Amino acid sequence: SGAKPLRVSTLRGYEIDIKMFCEYITDPRYPWLSECEARFSVAPRQVFHEDNSIVHVSEYEGDAARRPLTFDEVQALFDAADGLAARIRSRRRKGAVQAIRDAALLKCVYAFGLRRRETVMLDLVDLHRNAKLPHLDRFGALSVRHGKASRGGPSKRRTVLTVPEMEWISETLTHYLEEVRPALSSSSGSSSALWVTERGTRLSRRAANEAFCAARDAAGIDSSLDLHSLRHSYVTHLVEFDYPERFIQEQVGHSFSSTTAIYVGVSNEYRNRLLTRALHTRYGSDFEGAAR
């Protein structure tokens, strides 16, 4: 079909289409069986069976570099990032402050579901209060002013609310702003950028990538993953936290829900939880008895 091989998910989509057509044309409620026998002397039949169907080899079959991380992988990534900073500091080597900044940046990307450019283009003025979450101070919401543009248009803007499951980011950012950012550079106070270098300039996208790769490799996580996988993780985990689809779509700045759906790769545990909930709703106490 070309130089670029088809993805497993694409092939499965083709398979499902053909399988559904075969189910339709072989359905005894319709006259297609007898009509085909009369016209072609042969009856149609289902061509896909368990032994020749594409099997699920993984929970997520999209771009491997951007698959969502599990909760354990996210924790391992953050622990590794913190560990890198601790090791540099214990050896009294240069770069400890930068490593602490990098760990905070990765946590920010995940906690707000940000793209790479959106992250490095954040300014101090983009941190906002949320009247419904006063205890988070100025970390209740985040203004994204450099979102992905559509067809050459201007950058899209959105406000990302801090969800309760991510409230820990307020402590991370407080420590970064009060202790880490001032220690990076004497000129950081004159910069409007949230994420700065030791020269007081805005951190680059490349530096953000390198921060992720260093933590990823230290954590022993799949080396094919890139920084954008944290955004996919955010979407997937909000789904597993039972947030409405429309809310998630607004949080990540997608124009279409179909785009948000591509990001999702929920765990088997979540699927089982949904199934159990549905069975309880449908069968009530009868399901409890059957389960025992």
List the model feature ranges, each with a label.
Residues S1-G62, L84-K94:
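N-terminal core-binding DNA-recognition domain of tyrosine recombinases/integrases
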Residues V252, F256-L279:
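Catalytic-site neighborhood detector that most strongly recognizes the C-terminal catalytic loop/helix
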Residues P28-S34, V109-R138, R246:
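Short, charged phosphate-coordinating catalytic segments
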Residues R91-R92, T201, N209-E250, H254:
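Short, basic (Lys/Arg/His-rich) helix/loop patches that form interaction surfaces
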Residues A278-R292:
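C-terminal secondary-structure termini that scaffold catalytic or DNA-interacting sites
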Residues S150-T174, S190-F212:
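C-terminal catalytic core of Y-nucleophile DNA break-rejoin enzymes
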Residues V42, Q46, M121-T172:
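Conserved tyrosine-mediated DNA breakage-rejoining catalytic core shared by Y-recombinases
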Residues A76-R116:
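Basic, Lys/Arg- and aromatic-enriched nucleic-acid-binding interface segment
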